[in-house]
């Protein structure tokens, strides 16, 4: 795969740009041409900030009949978040269940888990999920903001969005003098970083943004080396005051830590194994993602505007590992699931929308109508028929070479083609001075064509989904709104792109949600709080009438929950950000080969989560922050026999503005060195551990 020597490139570009930059320029910020840009530039977001995930109507959080969260890039990077997943799990009710098999990016939200239920977008564009895996974006350096919509969102983004939608908005070109930021960092486990952020005007009509980031580490487990490179580049041409074009290319190249988890010993976690890595010596994990987009924005007249996004996405992923570890008497570890896997995925798509300000029955109204088309190719190579196993000592770390007993060896196994087409519309109508109706409809059609490259067989299926949403927002005061909504969503019984022939026989699962809530800003904008309550029912799950019966689409799962947030600026430099969530999720009707699981809680779903972040300006030059993340106990198996313990992890940081253009920072992660598991596999007998205590020192220079 292509590599970018980003550390060398960062320095070279910085030297080239230094000649044209103005010394002492202000930090790289988006222009305040929209509310979104202003909020991001100030490093804050509030209930008056439009959310890119909650609607395409440009509504603020107060105007949206749904539970949303917005994090500016400054907030994301200012809270020790290395990944987008780290950032969004500091918002209400979302927890990480990442593992190498899902790209380290899977989430749990509102009682529903994995990439089939929690959708992740990049600047509003969806990369279809292949075999349960998403590997982009790489890090948070190029992130301008992250918007979260909780609850069903198929009416906005199509099937597969029952739990939540996360939209990552990258940094955008801006007008004005060229401004640059260089960062160098070093910390525990030989972790190092070199990064560049540059942007500004090249002429009256041309502006750009360029972000480069290279990171590497020796890792906190044996043989845990990792490295990543990320590139985000965009060029904007303002053809006129009403017409603009933006061409962008984003790329990530990763060699993540080759750690597949830690086995329990006689059903118990042994702390002495924290740094052990039982993978083979020649294990490999590599991800390469590329996204190229052309965005056109046209203000046709005062009432009508159009936007088009044409995009090409390419992904290559490769794994070669011993994936499963089981403790054996005599303190041996049996290794199995020796698999070599490659994904090659290409996606071409286009989304066209029109936004119209108009009157509807004499009432002020705004509508968005659009069409979405995607063509996705997915090919997979593997050796899943391998049954090779071996044993290694519990003391120490793995070792040995990868071996496979697949009779066909490692090679091409399947090729899939999916064509997706959708029509969608949204509307907001001001019914009275205080009451507004927000509604939406969407029709999706997907045709899936799967080719088995071993026996040359072929299977295809067409699926369709109709979804809608309706919500009322009552503005009690300009700073307080009450809302209620009803929304639906659809999901494949697994990821649509890689449904096997048996799974293709089934229809889409269906979910419906009712939600009520309130949102309020107070103390002249120095504080805000939100509260949401919801009920979700998902039907047509794969289940059995009895443990020995054949699989049918007769299962049901539900969840009820509460979510609350609080943001306060207390004066004297104190800032408080807190949230908490509670969910009661269960299988209403679910039987599998192992037994009836009705009444059980789904795996990887914590009943309670909470987050707190406190920051204090110690002086004009020094700021400090400390935060805690709490995740309740979760079940690691559908029988609810194995429990992953709850955990609380504390992080802290301090920043010192040494000079006008030089800033030093210190990040402390897992301050109290808590040992904890984020998720499990092998029926809960193998835990994926969180990283131990670490520190990281940064130096930022702006010019």
Question: Model-predicted segments: where are they?
Answer:
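N-terminal periplasmic "start-of-domain" segments of outer-membrane beta-barrel proteins
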Residues: 34-75
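Outer-membrane beta-barrel translocator/receptor signature
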Residues: 129, 142-144, 155-231, 239-243, ...
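Membrane-embedded beta-barrel scaffold of Gram-negative outer-membrane proteins
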Residues: 295-323, 475, 481-485, 508-591, ...
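Gram-negative outer-membrane beta-barrel transporters
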Residues: 526, 535-537, 553-639, 672-675, ...
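C-terminal beta-signal and adjacent terminal beta-strands/loops
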Residues: 630-637, 656-703
């Amino acid at each position: 795969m292509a590599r970018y020597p980003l550390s060398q490139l960062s320095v070279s570009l910085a030297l080239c740009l230094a000649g044209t930059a103005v010394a002492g320029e202000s930090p790289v910020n988006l222009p305040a041409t929209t509310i979104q840009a202003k909020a991001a530039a100030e490093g804050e977001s509030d209930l008056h900030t439009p959310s890119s995930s909650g609607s395409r109507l440009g509504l603020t959080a107060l105007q949206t009949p749904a539970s949303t969260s917005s994090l500016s890039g400054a907030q994301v990077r200012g809270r020790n978040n290395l990944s987008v997943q780290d950032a969004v799990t500091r918002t209400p009710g979302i927890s990480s269940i990442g593992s190498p098999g899902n790209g380290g990016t899977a989430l749990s939200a509102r009682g529903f888990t994995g990439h089939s239920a929690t959708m992740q977008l990049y600047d509003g564009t969806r990369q279809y999920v292949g075999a349960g895996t998403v590997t982009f974006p790489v890090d948070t350096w190029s992130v301008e903001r992250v918007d979260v919509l909780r609850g069903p969102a198929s009416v906005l983004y199509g099937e597969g969005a029952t739990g939540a939608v996360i939209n990552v908005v990258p940094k955008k070109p801006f007008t004005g003098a060229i401004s640059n930021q260089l960062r160098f960092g070093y910390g525990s486990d030989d972790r190092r970083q070199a990064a560049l952020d540059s942007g500004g005007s090249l002429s009256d009509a041309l502006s750009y943004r360029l972000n480069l980031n290279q990171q590497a580490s020796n890792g906190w487990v044996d043989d845990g080396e990792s490295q990543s490179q990320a590139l985000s580049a965009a060029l904007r041409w303002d053809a006129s005051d009403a017409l603009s074009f933006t061409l962008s290319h984003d790329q990530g190249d990763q060699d993540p830590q080759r750690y597949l988890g830690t086995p329990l010993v006689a059903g118990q976690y042994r702390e002495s194994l924290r740094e052990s890595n039982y993978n083979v010596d020649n294990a490999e994990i590599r991800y390469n993602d590329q996204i190229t987009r052309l965005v056109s924005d046209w203000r046709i007249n005062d009432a009508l505007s159009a936007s088009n996004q044409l995009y090409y996405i390419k992904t290559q992923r490769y794994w070669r590992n011993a994936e499963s570890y089981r403790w054996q008497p005599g303190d041996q570890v049996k290794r199995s699931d020796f698999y070599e896997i490659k994904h090659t995925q290409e996606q071409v798509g286009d989304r066209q929308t029109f936004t119209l300000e108009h009157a509807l029955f004499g009432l002020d109204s705004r509508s968005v109508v659009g069409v979405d088309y995607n063509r996705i190719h997915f090919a997979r190579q593997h050796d899943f028929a391998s049954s090779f196993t071996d044993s290694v000592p519990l003391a120490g770390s793995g070792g040995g070479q990868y071996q496979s007993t697949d009779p066909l060896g490692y090679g091409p196994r399947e090729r899939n083609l999916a064509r997706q087409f959708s029509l969608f519309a949204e509307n907001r109508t001001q019914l009275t001075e205080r009451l507004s109706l927000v509604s939406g409809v969407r029709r999706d059609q997907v045709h899936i064509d799967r080719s088995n490259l071993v026996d040359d067989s072929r299977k295809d299926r067409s699926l369709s989904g109709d979804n809608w949403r309706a919500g009322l927002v009552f503005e009690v005061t300009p700073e307080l709104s009450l809302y209620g909504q009803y929304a639906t969503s659809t999901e494949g019984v697994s990821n649509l792109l890689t449904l096997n022939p048996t799974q293709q026989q089934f229809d889409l699962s269906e979910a419906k949600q009712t939600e009520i809530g309130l949102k309020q800003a107070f103390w002249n904008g120095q504080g805000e709080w939100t509260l949401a309550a919801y009920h979700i029912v998902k039907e047509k799950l794969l289940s059995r009438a009895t443990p020995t019966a054949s699989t049918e689409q007769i299962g049901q799962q539900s969840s009820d929950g509460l979510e609350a947030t609080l943001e306060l600026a207390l004066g004297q430099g104190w800032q408080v950000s807190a949230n908490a969530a509670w969910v009661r999720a269960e299988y209403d009707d679910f039987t599998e080969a192992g037994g009836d699981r009705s009444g059980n809680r789904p795996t990887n779903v914590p009943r309670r989560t909470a987050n707190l972040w406190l920051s204090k300006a110690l002086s004009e030059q020094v700021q400090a922050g400390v935060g805690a993340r709490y995740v309740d106990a979760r079940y690691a198996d559908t029988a609810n026999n194995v429990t992953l313990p709850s955990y609380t992890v504390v992080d802290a940081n301090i920043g010192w503005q040494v000079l006008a253009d030089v800033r030093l920072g210190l990040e402390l992660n897992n301050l109290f060195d808590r040992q904890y598991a984020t998720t499990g596999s092998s029926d809960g007998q193998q835990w994926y551990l969180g990283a131990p205590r670490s520190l990281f020192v940064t130096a930022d220079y702006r010019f």
